[in-house]
């Protein structure tokens, strides 16, 4: 069941869904708009090979921003201004606001799992022309869906509690894989 604006306001009022800071104008008909936060990570163009088993943060440049230009076809990680907390029976779909999609910007399909807490880091792919983005601009739209029952294992993954832009974390996955297959 997708939560409409009345449901969302009720869940927010009861504290079942937490969004901080929450602005009233961001609660929409069937979701909540989240805003561009104050930090991005640009992907560094290189011929070096990225190895997920030995991640190197030198592939990214983290910048504190009030505004930034996403260049044509550039890939950028950005964080939301808001910190969210979801209960064990609510998940969210992350969508780019249509005004930005109509400019040619793109984000990959992204889900926020039930039980997640943190700021959302999202990948944005640039358009065919440069686009200026400012901190505080409503940028992504979360559509919340209630599960039929609380999930058995709420999200407790490597991105739980993240604040600011968070780079990809692969080492844990590689370590888990190796530990499972070396027995």
Curated annotation (Swiss-Prot):
SUPFAM superfamilies: dUTPase-like
GO molecular function terms noted in the UniProt entry: dCTP deaminase activity; nucleotide binding
Coiled coil (UniProt feature): none
Active site annotation, chain numbering: 123 (proton donor/acceptor)
Top-level taxon in the UniProt lineage: Archaea
Metabolic or biological pathway: Pyrimidine metabolism; dUMP biosynthesis; dUMP from dCTP (dUTP route): step 1/2
EC code(s) of this entry: 3.5.4.13
Catalytic function, reaction form: dCTP + H2O + H(+) = dUTP + NH4(+)
Residues the record lists as binding dCTP: 97-102, 113, 155, 162
Swiss-Prot/TrEMBL keywords: Hydrolase, Nucleotide metabolism, Nucleotide-binding
Assembly and binders: Homotrimer.
NCBIfam families, per database record: dCTP_deam (TIGR02274)
Family: Belongs to the dCTP deaminase family.
Name of the protein in its database record: dCTP deaminase
Organism lineage: Archaea, Thermoproteota, Thermoprotei, Sulfolobales, Sulfolobaceae
